[in-house]
Each structure stands twice: as C-alpha cells, then as structure tokens.
UniProtKB/Swiss-Prot annotation:
Main location: cytoplasm
Pfam families, alphabetized: Phe_tRNA-synt_N (PF02912), tRNA-synt_2d (PF01409)
Name by which UniProt lists this protein: Phenylalanine--tRNA ligase alpha subunit
Keywords noted in UniProt: Aminoacyl-tRNA synthetase, ATP-binding, Cytoplasm, Ligase, Magnesium, Metal-binding, Nucleotide-binding, Protein biosynthesis
Gene that this polypeptide is encoded by: pheS
C-alpha cells in the first residue's frame, strides 16, 4: 500500500480542487493518443491521485464541514471525468479516421498481376474427353457414387461369388448386408441409362470410382474413369474399333492407333483389352495397355429390357489418371492426389 506521505495532497477548498481539476484537464489535452490519455487518467484519477485522495480525507473533517467539502470534491471529479470522456471521444474519432485512410483502396491504382488458379489436370482431361464425345454427337451421363449392388454387379452379369464383390476389392456400405457399395466402375450409369431412356443410346460416363487399392505409384483407391456405351441396331466390333481410333487420335495425335486383344469381362461378349500406340513426349513410341472394351453381353441387354435380337451395343472404359500418366510421362500416380503445387503448376495453373 502507498504510504500517505507519498500521496499528493490537495487543499479541500474550491480553489485547491479547481487547481487539481485544471491540472488534469491540461494533461488530458496534451495526450496525443489513447495510450497517453489512459496514462494521464491514472495520474489524475487513480487511487493515489489528488482528487481521489481528497475524497478519502473527508473523514478527517468536522461533521459540519464534510457536506460542503464532499460537494466540491464531487464537482471537481465530475468536471474531470466529463473532460476525459470528451478527449477520449475525439482521440477515438481521429484514430478511426487514420485506420480508414490506411485501409482505403484506390480502385484506380493499377494492380500487380498475380498467379491465376485453374482446374486440376484430372478435371481438365476429363472435360477434354467429354468434349470429344459431345463432338461425336454423344451425350454425357452421370450417376450416384454410392450404388446398389444390383446396378454395380448383378445387372452387369457378375455372378454372385465373383471376386470383385469381396471386401478385398470393393468398399461395402455399413451396415453389413445393406446392399450398397461405393461404385467400382461407372458401368452402373450405363445400366441406369438403358432403363430410363429410349433407344438408340450413345453416352459417355466420366466419373469417380472406388476400389480397395493401396496408394502407390500406379494405383489409388479413388480414381476416375470414363466409359462409353452405344446401343443401336447393327452395331459391330468395327464400330467399336472406329470409336476407339477416333478417341486415341484426338487425345494422343493423328499418328496414334489402337489394337484390341481378346480378354474376358462379365458385361461384354466378346471382350477385349485395348492398347494404344503413340509417340510420347520423350521421342519414343510404343504400345501401352489403355482399357477394356467389347460388345455388350446379351444378358446385360436383357436385364435392361433391350431385345438382343434387334439391338446390339458396344462398351469401353479407361482410367483418367492412367491416361494422364502415360500421355504426359508421369512416373508416380501419387503426384496427382497429393496437391503438390510443383506438380499442378505445369498442368492446372497458368500465370
């Protein structure tokens, strides 16, 4: 506690209290900012300041003098408090004006050109492929990512114990037995389209799919596919091959070509793998496996309510990430999902 000898004394008279108030008002007027004003207030209205000290000394006066002396103390303190509030309001107004001036934006001032963002390379390639099919007169179709097992497997001629149905290959939606999965391909979109549209059908189905793969240089559990489906009268493998050739030449250059090799898929018969030949960016050229294709299995057409004696169809599908990977000579698929700007800068960002 501060010793009473250290406390500034003020005469308990109108003249003495006015002098203390004058000193406080002078200190407030000299404050250049709110911090200095707060310091001046502590000096003149704090516990050890003259006017508060005078209030505490009222008890030492004779009773008949306390009322008048108390009135004088209150008048002095009220005068000082009023002046403090006025000065504080003025300093706050000046501070706010300074802040507004500092934050003012000159809309006529030329701006520096910054780096512009753009779409991810996977999105760019997906849209390029979609544009190719739209240019051929095809439609773009989409469907749910959480899919019924019926559309993902049963309607596409997968037998009940097919390995693709297991937990080792497919994400099943809880609870067990719900009959729902994260779609493993975009083929369910083809079945949904055949059930909901009139024939003929020519659709491309780009989209995200899910499989229980570990993320490594050539695999990712979440990736993108584009699948195509055509159902019409008189379609053959020749129409399929011509479509694949057009897609390859548009994506990889006029020198690109495709070949098909026999394979097996439940939803096509006959089925084939499709390879693409093109000149890469390093000056080399060669064949590389691209995707799967074939004529739509009659069982799939029947499940969609299509008469296989009157209509035929072909289908194909390939991975977007894989296409981007070998088209652009990318050694590691993980670069596509890790969001590293050093990867996206050459593809999805333009200055």
């Amino acid at each position: 506690m501060t010793d009473s000898a250290d406390t500034p004394q003020v005469e308990l008279s109108e003249q003495g209290l006015n002098a203390a108030a004058d000193a406080a008002e002078k200190a407030f007027a000299e404050a250049a900012n709110l911090e200095e004003l707060a310091a001046a207030r502590r000096e003149h209205l704090g516990d050890d300041a003259p006017i508060p000290a005078a209030r505490r000394s009222l008890g030492s006066l004779p009773k008949d003098q306390r009322k008048d002396a108390g009135r004088l103390v209150n008048m002095a303190r009220g005068r000082v408090e009023k002046r403090f509030a006025q000065v504080k309001a003025e300093l706050e107004r000046k501070r706010n004006e300074e802040v507004l001036r500092a934050e003012r934006i000159d809309v006529t001032e030329p701006t520096t050109r910054g780096q512009r963002g753009a779409q991810h390379p996977i999105t760019i390639l997906s849209e390029q492929i979609a544009d190719i099919f739209v240019g051929m007169g095809w439609e773009i179709a989409d469907g749910p990512e959480v899919e019924a097992e019926y559309f993902n497997f049963d309607s596409l001629n997968f037998i009940p114990d097919h390995p693709a149905r297991t937990l080792q290959d497919t994400f099943h939606i809880a609870p067990e037995g719900s009959g729902q999965v994260l779609r493993t391909h975009t083929s369910p979109v083809q079945m949904r389209t055949m059930l909901s549209r009139d024939l003929p059908i020519y659709i491309a189905c780009p989209g995200r799919v899910f499989r229980t793969d570990e993320l490594d240089a050539t695999h990712t559990p979440v990736f993108h596919q584009v699948e195509g489906l055509a159902v019409d009268k008189g379609l053959t493998m020749a129409h399929l091959k011509g479509t694949l050739d057009h897609l390859a030449k548009t994506l990889f250059g006029e020198e690109a070509k495709t070949r098909i090799r026999p394979n097996y898929f439940p939803f096509t018969e006959p089925s084939a793998e499709v390879d693409v030949w093109f000149a890469d960016k390093k000056g080399g050229a060669g064949w590389i496996e691209w995707g799967g294709c074939g004529m739509v299995n009659p069982n799939v057409l029947i499940a969609a309510g299509v008469d296989p004696e009157e209509y035929s169809g072909f289908a194909f599908g390939m991975g977007i990430e894989r296409t981007l990977q070998f088209r652009n000579g990318l050694p590691d698929m993980r670069d596509m999902v890790e969001g590293d700007v050093r990867f996206t800068l050459p593809f999805g960002v333009r200055r």
